[in-house]
Amino acid sequence: MKTQFAILLITLVLFQMFSQSDAILGEIWKGIKDILGKRGLNDLSDLDELFDGEISKADLDFLREIM
């Protein structure tokens, strides 16, 4: 009886671990597909507009004011 109970507990624990890891791996796979999909790559190109490599005079004045 003790052996059957131990096997049942071990089976339940392993099943719980499998079901949780399946959910985590599913979310990771979904994120990878979102990033590497056509729409995901198009969305990443929108981030290029956020960075402007040139520093204007107003930016320099603001940095001097902070220092």
Curated annotation (Swiss-Prot):
Q: Which UniProt keywords apply?
A: Amidation, Antimicrobial, Cleavage on pair of basic residues, Membrane, Secreted, Signal, Target cell membrane, Target membrane
- Name the residues of the propeptide: 40-67
Q: Which residues carry this modification: Leucine amide?
A: 36
The residues the entry assigns to the signal sequence are: 1-23
> What does the UniProt entry say about where the protein is found?
Secreted; Target cell membrane
Q: Which GO terms describe its cellular component?
A: extracellular region; membrane; other organism cell membrane
User: What domain of life does the native source organism fall in?
Assistant: Eukaryota
Annotated tissue distribution: Expressed by the venom gland.
Describe the function of this protein: Amphipathic peptide with antimicrobial activity. Does not show antiviral activity.
Family designation: Belongs to the non-disulfide-bridged peptide (NDBP) superfamily. Short antimicrobial peptide (group 4) family.
Protein name (database record): Peptide Hp1165
- Name the species this protein comes from: Heterometrus petersii
